[in-house]
Amino acid sequence: MIGTPYTEGARRAMLLGCGELGKEVAIELQRLGVEVIGVDRYANAPAMQVAHRSHVINMLDAKALRAIIELEKPHLVIPEIEAIATQTLVEMEAEGVNIIPTARATKLTMDREGIRRLAAETLGLPTSPYFFCDTETEFNQAIREIGVPCVVKPVMSSSGKGQSVIRDIAQSNKAWQYAQEGGRAGGGRVIVEGFVPFDYEITLLTVSAVNGIHFCAPIGHRQEDGDYRESWQPQAMSDEVLAKSQAIASKVVEALGGYGLFGVELFVKGNEVYFSEVSPRPHDTGLVTLISQDLSEFALHVRAILGLPIPNIHQHGPSASAVILAEGTSSNIRYQGIGAALEAVNTQLRLFAKPDIDGRRRLGVALARDIDIDSAISKALDSASKVKVIF
């Protein structure tokens, strides 16, 4: 049952994290009449602008997080970022609070160690070789054992912060320092992974719903500086590789438990598929689904967490997204060229309405459909290039 917002019978959902992905989740919740409460560490975050009300707290502060949940008494608590006091969510779930998809899934995926050990050691899924390191001495030993090239990531980071590829042993010290600076906790444990010389990488959006497990068409993407720049759907792949990918995604999602959409990241080399990471929430590369599917990843997530069925997912054809990236410092961001960006048929824009910028920041995304993937990517890139960010 869903009541009307602001009434006694309202269904209340609290978003922990109010960025561009949370904004789309908030919009989909509102389409189904859910009362939305946004929570983030800064004011006027994108999802706050479309929520019924919002709060600014440090979500890594266990007492502050518990206090806001106890104040609002939401029926659903939906983590949309990793930087949250997850142990508090575990405790509150045991007290009866509904954490999406589960508090365990949120805690396991908050850091790379929990999910990697689940995938490789508990589920026995194929992954790259890896070591976890607390000190620079352990780090250097791990590099010697794995060899170069190898990939270094903070155990806790997001959006590519602190990640680097070591191609020469002489880069080790710099990579260690960069990883320490990029971790969400201000330094600490890192993972050293063997470099998989993959042919391509995909995000397989996997939905756990009341009527079973569902898959979106695979999404290909290009990364730069640890963050995505373009994504496209569908990524061409053989039936054999797709079946392997779906089997891996199913095992991970079922092990994590709960209802919702999960972004499962996989490497593909030949006919082999390797597990990389998983997010128990919509994925940034999945922004392409705003134009590529009848139900976007955000609509699917909301249906699933509300316990609603998903009869089918229709994919419209070759589609792409291209990031609108800017660099500078301003709290008065404006945009020009929007008309030019929307001149081509089957193009759309999403401007995230972020309140400020200090450095490099993703401010929007261009979306396009065309006759084939290359044409869709080209159209999305062209559209994105026409949007001029004014400070």
From Swiss-Prot:
Protein name: Formate-dependent phosphoribosylglycinamide formyltransferase
Family: Belongs to the PurK/PurT family.
Pfam family, one: ATP-grasp
Amino-acid positions noted as binding ATP in the UniProt annotation, renumbered to this chain: R112, K153, S158, S159, G160, K161, G162, Q163, E193, G194, F195, V196, E201
Superkingdom of source: Bacteria
GO molecular function, one term: phosphoribosylglycinamide formyltransferase 2 activity
Residue ranges occupied by any ATP-grasp domain in the UniProt entry: 117-306
Reaction(s) this enzyme catalyzes, per UniProt: N(1)-(5-phospho-beta-D-ribosyl)glycinamide + formate + ATP = N(2)-formyl-N(1)-(5-phospho-beta-D-ribosyl)glycinamide + ADP + phosphate + H(+)
Keywords: ATP-binding, Ligase, Magnesium, Metal-binding, Nucleotide-binding, Purine biosynthesis
Binding site for Mg(2+): E265, E277
EC number: 6.3.1.21
GO (cellular component) term, any one: cytosol
Any one biological process term the GO annotation gives: 'de novo' IMP biosynthetic process
Residues reported in the UniProt entry to bind N(1)-(5-phospho-beta-D-ribosyl)glycinamide: E20, L21, E80, D284, K354, R361, R362
Assembly with partners or alone: Homodimer.
Purpose of the protein: Involved in the de novo purine biosynthesis. Catalyzes the transfer of formate to 5-phospho-ribosyl-glycinamide (GAR), producing 5-phospho-ribosyl-N-formylglycinamide (FGAR). Formate is provided by PurU via hydrolysis of 10-formyl-tetrahydrofolate.
Enzyme class at the top of the EC tree: ligase
Record SUPFAM superfamilies: Glutathione synthetase ATP-binding domain-like, PreATP-grasp domain, Rudiment single hybrid motif
Gene (name only): purT
Pathway stated in the Swiss-Prot or TrEMBL entry: Purine metabolism; IMP biosynthesis via de novo pathway; N(2)-formyl-N(1)-(5-phospho-D-ribosyl)glycinamide from N(1)-(5-phospho-D-ribosyl)glycinamide (formate route): step 1/1
UniProt xrefs under InterPro entries: ATP-grasp, ATP-grasp_carboxylate-amine, ATP_grasp_subdomain_1, PreATP-grasp_dom_sf, PurT, PurT/PurK_preATP-grasp, PurT_C, Rudment_hybrid_motif
